[in-house]
Amino acid sequence: MVTAVLNHHQRAGGLVHRLRKQQAHDWRLKCRPVCASTELELSHWLQSVPWRGEFPRAVLADHQTRGQGQRGRRWEAARGGVWISAALPWNSSSGHADMLGLMVAYALCERLEQAGLPVRIKWPNDLLIDSHKLAGLLPRLVFRGGRLRMVRIGVGMNVANPVPAGAIALRDLLPPGCARREVWTVEVLRALERIQTLANRPELVRREIEKRLWAHQVKDPQSGEIWEIQGLALNGALQLCQGARSASWTRWPDANHDNLYNLA
């Protein structure tokens, strides 16, 4: 049964009702009107109430003042969007988690495509529509005793919030009344539930993600070289070629840091 835990925010009751109506998993939810970061809130929750792995947990915020992004980037998440940090149990029967962020991206694409939206996946963790950023993901794997026990996923999706240049919100894309934060919060949680099913079908996930990749070429920000995108490896690495040369990126190269990719 979905429950709201240690929560005095009226939003929680509506979410619990919607999730129960859809026969969702047994989520434990915390909703905050405002917080520095849902990632930090989730970490504190996992520390104060030790993880036993029975139920997935999620922290949701109306407004984040210091949201966490890739490589420690900080950003402010305004009211009107979906800002979630979730922890889900994972065990040996849950399948492979190598493509965790991409699996979440694909699961979100499925939900958005049902609304008629032409979503593209910008490797590794962003969702784009018409080259504008709609959502970003922050995946993490948590090991205990050398075994994967938990996956953590942060999701930020622009719904009815103001967005900066280069971004887009669902309210700009959907008919009036269809870009409701409560509805899309449930859609995100349902997408997170789907990843364990997808983890047992890695070839399917790879094929479907490759169909939705945002571009055919990428530019290396360090060298300025243009590489052709060939597809994905089963571990989620981006496979590239340039004439007779090939490369595999395991993360996006940074112009100020060493690349984490292999050349051949």
Language-model region placement:
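N-terminal lobe of the biotin/lipoate ligase/transferase fold
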Residues: 1-114, 232, 260-264
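Long, positively charged amphipathic alpha-helical accessory segments at protein N-termini or as interdomain linkers
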Residues: 1-12, 24, 91-119, 129-264
